[in-house]
Structure formats: C-alpha cells, structure tokens
Amino acid sequence: DVETSLRNLRTGYIDLYQLHNLPEKDIEKVFGPGGAYEALTAAREAGKIGHIGVTAHSADALKILVEDCADRIETVMFPYNIVEDQGRDVLALAREKGIGTIAMKPLAGGNLDDWELALRYIAASGVIDIMIPGMGSPEEVDRNASVNLAAPLTAEDLSRCDAVRKELGTQFCRRCGYCAPCPNGIDIPSNFLMANYARKYGLAGWAEQRYKAMPYHAGSCVMCGACEKRCPYGLPIRDMLEGVAKVFGY
C-alpha cells in the first residue's frame, strides 16, 4: 500500500504511483467502490502521491484501461520494444487522450544486444513518451544517456530490426519473475539466462559453472504448471525448461 511504499522509499511523497500489472478480470474491482484506485485518490488528496498510473502486460487489459479509464489515469506502462509492438495502436490512442506512455522492457528483458538500436527504435515509434531500460552500473547509465534518440531509423536499421525479430521470436523470458515461486525451488529466469549464455553467446563453460552452482536446476521440474499460470506472457515454461535441461544435461 501507499504507506508501505513511503516507508520503503524513506520519503513522504511519491510523484507517480502506479497500479501494477492489472489483469482484465481485476480492472472493474480496482476502479470500483472501495477499490485500490479509491485509496490512491485519497492518498493524492492527502498530498502523499502526485499522480496515478497503471501498468499492464496484456494488450487486452491495456485496451480496456485506455478506453474505459482514461479520465482516471495519467500514465500507462506497457512492454514495448523491437520484438513486442502489439500495443502500438492502443498506446497511440492513450497519447491522443492525454495519457503519458511508458515503455517497460525496452531491451526485451536483456535479450536485445544492440541497446542503441533498441532505444532508437522506441524513440522513433511515435507512441512512447518515456522508456525505462534497466541499468546495473554507472557505465550503463552513461551508455544509455549517450544515445541520439532524435536520429531517424535508416533502411539498414529497419533491416536489422527485422533480423532481430526473426532470431528472437516471441517465446523468450523477460525475467519479470512473476513465475515464482517454483514449488521445487527452481530459479526459472536464471536457468533460462544461463542457457542463453551457453547457446547465444558461446560462453558454454562460463554458463555451465554458474548453472552447476544453482541449488535447483531445470531437470528438477515436475511439470506441475504453476509457473505457466502466473506468466503474463503465456510462455510454455515447462517446454522451455526441458530445453535448458538438454543444454546442460540435467
């Protein structure tokens, strides 16, 4: 809740407070009487937050939020990158309605190697106001800040984008962590990450060492399917874990 967020952030005010990962089935409840939105408006009136936004992973949920809740929200945050542009039309509508648009997963959960092309692609889309790439070091901050977002995409750039789409497809882990917890203790995103290092980057030995150090491995999956019910991207996680087990042998 708001009070917990204020304590965790050690502040008395949050500029933008977002209702996170709203599924279609919860939207009416969240914005109805006694719902979370009502509590946030009270917090805003009390001067504890400044603005209210929403985030979603489903294009259908995004559409409902923009079409039915535009008078109550100030921002929407949605995955948008070279391989995920299914929200383009609704994000364009959001901007027409005066709703700020935020691109999450601009590097597709770390799966896009060409960070400069990835950020320029989003900037050139015309439907995004702000993008939020994850940064783990001062060097990555400087790197992202150095990108010329005003540079238009060339024919060569667009060809590279097409190549990325063909290589990556849509069935890849964004490392959001919503699949957790695994009943067998498997760190699913990290298992996928190590397999990617082995297959994609030629770091088989390096990845094998780190995979071995994990307490639970892909081969421990009992196919219960709990993770797939939680995945906002509908990934066939069990099949993907089988693929990881084949890479490392267990």
Where are the regions a protein language model picked out?
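Glycine/proline-rich, positively charged
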Residues: D1-I102, L107-G110
